[in-house]
Amino acid sequence: MSAPDTVSPLDLRFSAAELAERRDRIQSFIRDTVAAAGAERCVLGLSGGIDSTTVAHLTVDELGADALHGLVMPGAVSRDQNMSDAERVAEDLGIEYDVVEIDPFVTQLTDVFPDAAGDEVAVGNARARTRAVINYFVANHGDGVVLGTGNRAEAMTGYYTKYGDQAVDCNPIGNLYKMQVRQLARDLGVPEDLVTKAPTAELWADQTDAGELGVDYDTIDAVLAVHVDGGLPASATATHLDIDPSVVETVRDLYGASKHKRAMPPAP
């Protein structure tokens, strides 16, 4: 399933020179992070989506295939196509990878707490946190660093599991809007079917990012760039982007409600 075509309210793509500079900066960041940690390699969860695929390409391009260990971690709600895509990415790049089923871990929880078995959010977040545990188990055993796959749109809207998919050592594409991730992915040679695939966290059945967030990523990017990062008032943002004010409010509310995810745990 591909992401629906949308007309972006704002073009945030880089110029050719800016794209080359940003790609070089990210790849140098990956190299420097690994060196600073004194690590031997990187560990990356592969979902078959654009974000993890882009990070995989960046890492292999900079450090070589031997420096990256991929983990494909399917669960009961994972689409077969996504898992096949994840394995295809690993094989195309020539990296070592393992497939680890996460349901046996999650089932241990629902067996002990059966009343929670029907709680989509609790079980879905447990899936994300289980993947984080597996990432770090492999990284600790192999003297590696865990690479994150989060982008700026996800970070600023809180569209991730706390201590789950953002439990990582670094986020190579963390300062890129989703539109920019797509642009970088194409520049890296990521297959077009992965670039245009509808994003999903696959925390529960038939979940899509746009369906859960209520706004498509191009619009989220635009509101974040103009209103949250740019500081333009909400009403002026709606006028500038020619979108309904309620859309700006939705993105602003997502940003506000997720501030706790972007902060260290409070202490008295």
Swiss-Prot record:
GO function term, MF aspect, one: NAD+ synthase activity
List of residues binding ATP: 45-52, 149, 178, 200
Positions of Mg(2+) binding: 51, 154
Catalytic activity: deamido-NAD(+) + NH4(+) + ATP = AMP + diphosphate + NAD(+) + H(+)
E.C. number(s) listed in UniProt: 6.3.1.5
One Pfam assignment: NAD_synthase
Source organism, top-level taxon: Archaea
CDD domains named among the record's database cross-references: NAD_synthase
Coiled-coil stretches noted in the UniProt entry, renumbered to this chain: none
Keywords on record: ATP-binding, Ligase, Magnesium, Metal-binding, NAD, Nucleotide-binding
Keyword Amino-acid biosynthesis among record annotations: no
Class of the enzyme per the UniProt entry, highest EC level: ligase
Subunit structure: Homodimer.
Family: Belongs to the NAD synthetase family.
Protein name: NH(3)-dependent NAD(+) synthetase
Organism: Halobacterium salinarum (strain ATCC 700922 / JCM 11081 / NRC-1)
